[in-house]
């Protein structure tokens, strides 16, 4: 087990001395903290730690038990994750009504292109139930008559299936901090724009109205700030002068699925590190096999350094 693979997450009410109590318990068991981050949103406290457990002087289950008991005493939930515990990750897909991304993820898992077990499809509408059930994946409709999701029920489903990764495959609702904090850097969303441009709803329409020449899609980790999480992959496409919204959407949707699948594969391969809001490839990852951002073809067409060329100064200035 490597230090970077051991994560501890604390979620609950803020309390004086909480951090000291938890870190002391870890130090007493030979666990060194390599990175610690904390935040408060809507009255909910979150602390995440990456720890070096190679010198741990206790068993894993004893550590989990001790932290759970301390969490109950402090009124918080403490999770310990050893991703090396499982060879196959468990994935939940959240959707609303659009099917193209869900279908792509289900097909990729069924074909073995993604080394993952999809154990739940969660939605705020019942529209895509038949698609999930056709792939023998349990479907959970957590929305009311207006489509508002019950996030407490979502948390129950995620816990019931012991979910490692949540994929928002065109899920048209904003996740609250009670979910985002518990699954930090484990929720991937695909958004139909080249973020940070055009966040929020109707991104293709926003792009059309602003007259952009190039539009695109972004797969990113989810944070409590809408469409501002660390970017994993992006795809771009040309927007013709006379393109209608439906035509832009038709160009973008296949790329949404492509960017999302690549982001999932990068995450499952443990190739992505996140630091201060930016993704990077982990040390030791083969850059020829994995990459972040645009495809190599797109990068080749957009050089990072100016291209030298002869310029006819008189022609530019209108001289003879």
Label each region the model flagged.
Residues 14, 35-37, 194:
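Short, well-ordered turn and helix-capping elements at secondary-structure junctions
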């Amino acid at each position: 087990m490597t230090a970077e693979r051991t994560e501890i997450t604390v979620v609950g009410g803020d309390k004086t001395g909480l951090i000291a109590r938890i870190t002391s318990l870890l130090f007493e068991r030979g666990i060194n903290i390599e990175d610690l981050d904390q935040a408060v949103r809507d009255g909910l406290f979150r602390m995440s730690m990456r720890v070096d457990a190679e010198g741990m002087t206790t068993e894993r289950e004893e550590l989990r038990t001790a932290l759970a008991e301390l969490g109950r005493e402090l009124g918080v939930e403490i999770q310990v994750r050893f991703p090396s515990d499982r060879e196959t990750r468990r994935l939940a897909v959240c959707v609303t009504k659009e099917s193209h991304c869900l279908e792509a993820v289900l097909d990729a898992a069924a074909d073995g292109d993604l080394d993952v077990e999809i154990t739940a499809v969660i939605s705020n509408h019942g529209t895509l139930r038949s698609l999930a059930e056709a792939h023998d994946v349990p479907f959970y409709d957590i929305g009311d008559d207006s489509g508002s999701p019950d996030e407490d029920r979502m948390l129950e489903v995620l816990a019931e299936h012991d979910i490692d990764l949540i994929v928002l495959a065109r899920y048209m609702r904003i996740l609250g901090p009670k979910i985002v904090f518990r699954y930090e850097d484990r929720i991937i969303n695909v958004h139909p724009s080249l973020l940070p441009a055009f966040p929020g709803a109707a991104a293709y329409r926003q792009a059309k109205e602003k007259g952009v020449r190039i539009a695109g899609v972004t797969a990113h980790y989810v944070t409590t700030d809408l469409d501002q999480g660390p970017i994993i992959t992006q795809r771009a496409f040309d927007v013709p002068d006379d393109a209608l919204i439906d035509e832009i959407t038709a160009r973008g949707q296949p790329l949404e699925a492509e960017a999302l699948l690549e982001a999932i594969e990068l995450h499952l391969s443990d190739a992505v590190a996140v630091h201060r809001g930016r993704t990077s490839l982990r040390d030791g990852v083969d850059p020829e096999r994995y990459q972040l951002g645009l495809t190599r073809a797109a990068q080749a067409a957009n050089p990072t350094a100016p291209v030298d060329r002869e310029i006819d100064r008189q022609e530019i200035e209108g001289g003879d």
